[in-house]
């Protein structure tokens, strides 16, 4: 029993000392964190610009946009037609009671 109590006491003291050491440790300043963040964003932007310059990626993007345009054009035309029909239905409803 004494061994168990001593073990628990030792673990408690060690965890408290660890917490104390963590509190006393120097925290990184906000300026260094912001500087590191901007450096990372800048590096990422440079890498992205290098990747965008490749002709293969440009060809893939162009093919994607052309395919999207081919697929969306009929949908947009149908949506426009449906909208005109929908609005004309309400215009006809409004003019109908006036003629009766």
UniProtKB/Swiss-Prot annotation:
<keyword id="KW-0964">Secreted</keyword>
<dbReference type="GO" id="GO:0008035">
    <property type="term" value="F:high-density lipoprotein particle binding"/>
</dbReference>
<dbReference type="InterPro" id="IPR006801">
    <property type="entry name" value="ApoA-II"/>
</dbReference>
<keyword id="KW-0813">Transport</keyword>
<feature type="modified residue" description="Phosphoserine">
    <location>
        <position position="68"/>
    </location>
</feature>
<dbReference type="GO" id="GO:0030301">
    <property type="term" value="P:cholesterol transport"/>
</dbReference>
<comment type="similarity">
    <text>Belongs to the apolipoprotein A2 family.</text>
</comment>
<protein>
    <recommendedName>
        <fullName>Apolipoprotein A-II</fullName>
    </recommendedName>
</protein>
<dbReference type="GO" id="GO:0050766">
    <property type="term" value="P:positive regulation of phagocytosis"/>
</dbReference>
<dbReference type="GO" id="GO:0008289">
    <property type="term" value="F:lipid binding"/>
</dbReference>
<dbReference type="GO" id="GO:0018206">
    <property type="term" value="P:peptidyl-methionine modification"/>
</dbReference>
<keyword id="KW-0165">Cleavage on pair of basic residues</keyword>
<feature type="modified residue" description="Pyrrolidone carboxylic acid">
    <location>
        <position position="24"/>
    </location>
</feature>
<keyword id="KW-0873">Pyrrolidone carboxylic acid</keyword>
<keyword id="KW-0732">Signal</keyword>
<dbReference type="GO" id="GO:0120020">
    <property type="term" value="F:cholesterol transfer activity"/>
</dbReference>
<keyword id="KW-0558">Oxidation</keyword>
<feature type="modified residue" description="Methionine sulfoxide">
    <location>
        <position position="49"/>
    </location>
</feature>
<dbReference type="GO" id="GO:0046982">
    <property type="term" value="F:protein heterodimerization activity"/>
</dbReference>
<dbReference type="InterPro" id="IPR036172">
    <property type="entry name" value="ApoA-II_sf"/>
</dbReference>
<dbReference type="Pfam" id="PF04711">
    <property type="entry name" value="ApoA-II"/>
</dbReference>
<dbReference type="GO" id="GO:0032757">
    <property type="term" value="P:positive regulation of interleukin-8 production"/>
</dbReference>
<keyword id="KW-0597">Phosphoprotein</keyword>
<keyword id="KW-0445">Lipid transport</keyword>
<dbReference type="GO" id="GO:0034366">
    <property type="term" value="C:spherical high-density lipoprotein particle"/>
</dbReference>
<comment type="function">
    <text>May stabilize HDL (high density lipoprotein) structure by its association with lipids, and affect the HDL metabolism.</text>
</comment>
<keyword id="KW-0345">HDL</keyword>
<comment type="subunit">
    <text>Monomer. Interacts with NAXE and NDRG1.</text>
</comment>
<dbReference type="GO" id="GO:0042157">
    <property type="term" value="P:lipoprotein metabolic process"/>
</dbReference>
<dbReference type="GO" id="GO:0018158">
    <property type="term" value="P:protein oxidation"/>
</dbReference>
<feature type="modified residue" description="Phosphoserine">
    <location>
        <position position="54"/>
    </location>
</feature>
<dbReference type="GO" id="GO:0050821">
    <property type="term" value="P:protein stabilization"/>
</dbReference>
<dbReference type="GO" id="GO:0042632">
    <property type="term" value="P:cholesterol homeostasis"/>
</dbReference>
<feature type="signal peptide">
    <location>
        <begin position="1"/>
        <end position="18"/>
    </location>
</feature>
